[in-house]
């Protein structure tokens, strides 16, 4: 069973929202590279907004490898509409932040981490660009490995059109997110890369 979670943000997702049971669509995937599954490390799985659903399968996989006590999901919502929260709870500990303070910590995921004095050895994150930028800075402050899943325009999805390039550090130039770098080691990214992604947030169909 394949479940798709999406936000209406462009022509493609608008067409998705008009589909009904029995309609047929063409699909290409999975594309790019996923997160590395590190053994023996306590992990923060951090999701915000539409970046929450991709973290659920990761929570399941890390639970199978390391056990639920090594999986700490930190999820950021706008309000008390906490989709998928109960499913995350099946695979580890869950801490919630809401923008309006209706549930959990009032604020963002970093506020929740600090308020609850949470600790981990590695960060996996997917969500809005300001969140990713803050998590990159936090990981450098704490000396924690950090993997960020970026949002970018995906025209072809396989890196051929070069529409999804992201600038990296160390003279490596640009990497094609659609082909190689769907999940990036946070320290390899230029700050300008994260800013570039922010300008294209939710623009993918």
Predicted features, each with a name:
Residues 25, 30-32, 49, 53-55:
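Extended interfacial segments that mediate partner engagement and assembly in macromolecular machines
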Residues 1-21:
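Ferredoxin-reductase
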Residues 32-41:
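Short, Lys/Arg- and Gly-enriched loop/turn segments at beta-strand edges
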Residues 54-64:
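Histidine-anchored nucleotide/phosphate-binding helix
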Residues 43-46:
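Conserved beta-strand elements of the Class I
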Residues 74-205:
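Reductase modules of NAD(P)H-dependent flavoproteins
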Residues 66-70, 143-144:
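A short helix->loop->beta-strand "cap" motif at the edges of active sites that frequently abuts
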Residues 21-24, 163:
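Residue-level marker of beta-strand positions
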